[in-house]
Amino acid sequence: MFARPAIRACQSLKQPVRRYTNTPPPQSGNANNSRVGILIASAVGMAGFGTYFMFGQGTTPAAGVKALGAEPKKALEMEKGFVSLQLDDVEVVNHNTKRLRFKLPEDDMVSGLHVASALLTKFKPEGAEKPVLRPYTPISDEDQKGYLDLIVKKYEGGPMSTHIHELVPGQKLDFKGPLPKYEWSANKHPHVAMIAGGTGITPMYQIMRAIFKNPADKTKVTLVVGNITEEDILLKKQLAELENTYPQRFRAFYVLDNPPKDWAGTKGYITKDLLKTVLPEPKEENIKVFVCGPPGMMKAISGNKVSPKDQGEVSGILKELGYKQDQIYKF
């Protein structure tokens, strides 16, 4: 079976919980006990599926299999250092999130990122001694030529997200990359689970895109993603298309803290009971669980990372459910 029987709509949770809505995201690439619900914040400034909806008319997704021939030129390579890219277009996604398209130096260039990897942004505020650095995972395909797309949530008092939101087409931002994350290859795991909060969906999206655009990759994916309101759900159209196209291989479960009256999904918080119901069991062979979200969510679900290169110990709900260190990756 694809997974244990899953219940799409759960009853609203009644127990009190500690809220994480306004907790800023961890600055890295991308709950107190088992019965505490976790409110998922609707954003993570970080640490990528296809480009089913782009700006304006829409853009054809990059080819699923690279054509034979010379490797395309890469805009970003670590040895190049920071590269200034010009903002080409901006789309307002919701009240605090924008989608931004940056032109690569040449039309036939690709970004240079791979799956899974992120990039680093840099700018120096006026009067500051040091520049601000923040990682983001693009949502455009790694094979896409000519541009890269970011989804960025604006945080109150967040210097980088505020700066990016204030950019207008024609202005530039410095980028460096790729920042390696989890090295993905086709069929590396037969079943992966993804737990995301807000824009923590971006590194998950990057891996999902690689899986489902590759005909040779048969990996199954279970996604649990939490947000505050329905308008905060990012890439929902693409995720719905995936469910319709691959019903035996992809399932998405949405959790809203403040759902509309007609909401048919899960209401409230991501809980131990929900994850126990929908995720692959820890005893399944060679599974992987990816987690990406704000610090409060990470602490409650899996435990936080110690640093970009140190995953830290596994704790929280996933440990209580029996998942081991080597089964979990934190973005």
From Swiss-Prot:
Q: What is its main location?
A: mitochondrion
The yes or no answer to whether the keyword NAD is present is yes
Give its localization: Mitochondrion outer membrane
Q: Which UniProt keywords apply?
A: FAD, Flavoprotein, Membrane, Mitochondrion, Mitochondrion outer membrane, NAD, Oxidoreductase, Transmembrane, Transmembrane helix
Q: In its UniProt record, which GO terms are filed under biological process?
A: ergosterol biosynthetic process
Q: Which prosthetic group or cofactor does it need?
A: FAD
What are the residue boundaries of the FAD-binding FR-type domain, all occurrences included? 80-185
Listed GO MF terms:
cytochrome-b5 reductase activity, acting on NAD(P)H
Task: Show the catalytic activity.
Answer: 2 Fe(III)-[cytochrome b5] + NADH = 2 Fe(II)-[cytochrome b5] + NAD(+) + H(+)
Q: Which GO terms describe its cellular component?
A: mitochondrial outer membrane
Described by its record, this protein's role is as follows: May mediate the reduction of outer membrane cytochrome b5.
State the protein's name. Answer: NADH-cytochrome b5 reductase 2
Provide the species name.
Answer: Pyricularia oryzae (strain 70-15 / ATCC MYA-4617 / FGSC 8958)
